[in-house]
Regions:
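Short, contiguous strand/loop micro-motifs
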Residues: 53, 97, 120-121
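Acetyl-CoA-dependent GNAT
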Residues: 3-85, 89, 94, 107-108, ...
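Active-site acidic-Proline motif in GNAT/NAT acetyltransferases
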Residues: 68, 94-100, 128
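Conserved G/P- and acidic residue-centered "switch" motifs that form tight phosphate/ATP-binding loops
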Residues: 70, 101, 118
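Conserved GNAT acetyl-CoA-binding A-motif
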Residues: 107, 114-125
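Conserved acetyl-CoA-binding loop-helix of GNAT-fold acetyltransferases
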Residues: 93, 99-112, 135-139
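Loop/helix-junction capping segments adjacent to catalytic residues or to phosphate/diphosphate-binding pockets
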Residues: 13, 100, 131
Length: 163
């Protein structure tokens, strides 16, 4: 079984479907943990109706889509910030595809894309309950750092030099 990773326009049907799956999962996990219920359908509809970000389009960044046996199974975004720093964002692998190496491949592909944008380091933030993501980042050499933003949902911040 094989994985492939390739750039994808953020406004494509594939990207939109993966964004819906990503947002639904991380939002539901947050609300179930902190409020005891899933995301309110109106909030979900409002968030998903926003136009795709241009920050994940060249030359500012890139959205990458992972396909398993040709079927879309995950995504990751990379966006260039100031001072040769790139941010890794929206890393997602469909639950049925987890444990097959797709997350690692997406992150490594995003790092490679960041290098082509002349980034010398990569940063990210994540939540405490996203334990799978934190384990992946640590296994790939990311180090936890003090906060680099004030995102209300961020609870852990990581960085990695891009050699």
């Amino acid at each position: 079984m094989t994985w492939t990773v390739a750039p994808e326009p953020p406004d494509s049907p594939v990207a939109k479907a993966l964004w819906r799956a990503y947002y639904t999962e991380v939002s539901d996990r947050y609300y179930l943990l902190h409020r005891g219920h899933r995301t309110d359908p109106s909030e979900l509809a409002r968030e998903l109706s926003r136009p795709p970000t241009t920050e994940l389009s060249f030359p500012k960044g890139q959205l990458l889509v992972a396909r398993y046996e040709g079927e879309p199974a995950g995504s990751a975004g990379i966006r260039l910030l100031a001072d040769n720093t790139a941010e890794l964002t929206r890393v997602y692998v469909h639950p049925k595809m987890r444990g097959k190496g797709g997350g690692k491949l997406l992150v490594l592909s995003a790092e490679a894309k960041a290098r082509t944008l002349n980034a010398t380091r990569i940063i990210l933030d994540t939540r405490h309950d996203l334990t799978e993501a934190r384990a992946l980042y640590t296994a790939l050499g990311y180090e936890e750092t003090p906060p680099h933003n004030d995102d209300i949902y961020a609870e852990h911040w990581f960085t990695k030099p891009l050699a």
